[in-house]
Amino acid sequence: ESALAQHQTGRNSGVVHAGLYYPPGSLKARMAVAGAQSMYAYARAKGIAYDNCGKLVVACDESELPGLDRLAERAEANGVPARLLDPAAAREIEPYVRCVRALHVETTGIIDYPAVCRALADDIGAQGGEIRLGVGVASAESTPHGVEVHTTTGETLRADALVACAGLYADRVALACGLEPDARIVPFRGEYFELAPEKNYLVRNLIYPVPDPRFPFLGVHLTRMVHGGIHAGPNAVLALRREGYTWRDVDVAELRESLAWPGLWALAKRNIVPGAREVVRSLSKRQFAASLSRLVPGIEAADLRPAAAGVRAQALRRDGSMVEDFLVQTQGRQVHVLNAPSPAATAALEIADHLADSVEQVLAS
């Protein structure tokens, strides 16, 4: 990479997640709940822009009430402060929202994640570390005394241990380092729009739908960005390359690699209808706007301006099941992060502590 935060860190909703959605006891649940607080504390210490503004998850009709109730129960199980609201109470928080009931999640917020990344880079430099931009990993191997990493620039780097957090290339790096992960990264693009400034008054903070239980993403939502403006999205469509930020970004070899993984076909078979809906929404701004207007009436296609898309690095097993939790695998003195989609940005400092513990364990073994 030529710079920091070029992919998932710099191309997301900028949301600090409260830990609402994840199974109790999972790494995602525990690390998001703790991570939100540690991320806010880090931002305060470093002078990074953030706002613990809260969010609404809204049930737009009666059919979504059971799903909203399940989220409220999960919030309680995970220790997330949240309360159910009737429509009048919801409109005190978001005056233009349309709902039959809403869940107000107090510890959700927004933050400048690229600024967090730059601050962490400064911390690394202050402690004598070095970030080697423009250098790729060709392979790595364990040795009697640690690990040797061979780079694309012809260097061999030696260390006591290796921690690999390769995002969209996590599985490739693991394979190049001699591991055999039982899941593969399949890239899903999330497309965003920015609301026209004259319509920003429609959204105060964050408005989310009740997730469709048939599809493993949260649905398009409305998010106030920490430096201003309202972003809408993301949807979720298969990217045609790992860094496929538009439909024009195609890499035949990478696409063939995705299509060759049996898990993708199994996932597609189970999600034909919602998957097709996502593709239509990707190709039609009118359909995208229609999804948003369920949450906030008055948003039209003409109000949406294209914004930078992101690609989610999602690990997918051979049977088509998505790896739902964070996944870390160790081998010898290597520690590989094989699945870290949302809420990994929120949980970044907690994940770092977890990885530091893993390194201590492999060095002691």
Please give the residue ranges for each predicted region:
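Glycine-rich FAD pyrophosphate-binding loop
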Residues: E1-R11
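Dinucleotide-binding Rossmann-like beta1-alpha1 core, especially the glycine-rich loop
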Residues: V15-A89, C99, G219-H221, G229-H231, ...
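Short beta-strand to alpha-helix junction loop
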Residues: P23-A34, V58-G67, L103-D123, R132, ...
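A short coil-to-beta-strand element that immediately follows conserved catalytic motifs
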Residues: Y50-C53, I131, D182-F188, I299-A308
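A short, glycine/Asx- and small/polar-enriched loop/turn
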Residues: S63-G67, I93-V100, E141-E148, L157, ...
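C-terminal catalytic lobe of FAD-dependent flavoproteins
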Residues: F217, W247-A253, S258-S365
